[in-house]
């Protein structure tokens, strides 16, 4: 992709998962630049300081108005995914949301319609490609350390407390 312009990325929400996204983008994906991060909590500014190209905002509308984003990732609590995604999609910004897309099916359908109307891509992030256990399993398979595989089944158990789902 030599000569192509960098994709300008913004984030809304910089809780625990944000550092994983920032690491993957900085270390594994060429031609992408984190230009802005928004979180209502001013103390989260510290988590953004190591990203030289990023400007920190506490107001979503101000970030959207001042930055010409190609993509925005919604990493906020589940209860506000709809509100934040709607702002981005109405601005014609390609939007990727951490799971779940919304808490109500009607809201998810509305976001899908907004994406179509505004020529934006809407996606939900479900992959675990860069999780350490998944990378280890992939390496074991690639190194053929398991022998002939007949069937593989994986179950992932984790729990979230109520704070995770509040919005």
Sequence positions of predicted segments:
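Beta-loop-alpha module in the N-terminal Rossmann-like domain of NAD(P)-dependent dehydrogenases
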Residues: 21, 55-114
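Predominantly a Rossmann-like dinucleotide-binding segment in NAD(P)-dependent oxidoreductases
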Residues: 128-167
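Receiver (REC) domain switch-region micro-motif
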Residues: 37, 72, 152
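Rossmann-like NAD(P)(H) cofactor-binding subdomain of soluble oxidoreductases
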Residues: 80, 100, 123-129
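Rossmann-fold dehydrogenase core element
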Residues: 110-127, 147-152
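Structural signature of beta-strand start/N-cap positions in the alpha/beta core
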Residues: 8, 33-34, 68-70, 94, ...
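N-terminal Rossmann-like dinucleotide-binding module
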Residues: 1-51
């Amino acid at each position: 992709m030599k000569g192509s312009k960098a994709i300008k990325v913004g984030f809304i929400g910089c809780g625990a998962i944000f550092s994983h996204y920032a690491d993957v983008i900085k270390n594994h994906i060429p031609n992408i630049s984190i230009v802005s991060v928004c979180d209502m909590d001013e103390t989260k500014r510290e988590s953004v300081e190591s990203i030289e190209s990023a400007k920190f905002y506490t107001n979503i509308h101000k970030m959207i108005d001042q930055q010409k984003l190609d993509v925005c990732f919604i990493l906020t609590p589940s209860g506000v995914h709809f509100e934040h995604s709607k702002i981005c999609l109405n601005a014609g910004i390609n939007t990727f949301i951490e799971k779940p897309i919304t808490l109500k099916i009607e809201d998810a359908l509305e976001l899908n319609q907004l994406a179509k109307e505004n020529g934006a891509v809407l996606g939900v992030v479900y992959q675990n490609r860069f999780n350490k256990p998944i990378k280890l399993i992939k390496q074991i398979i690639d190194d053929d350390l398991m022998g002939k595989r007949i069937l593989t089944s994986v179950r992932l158990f984790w729990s979230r407390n109520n704070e995770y789902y509040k919005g």
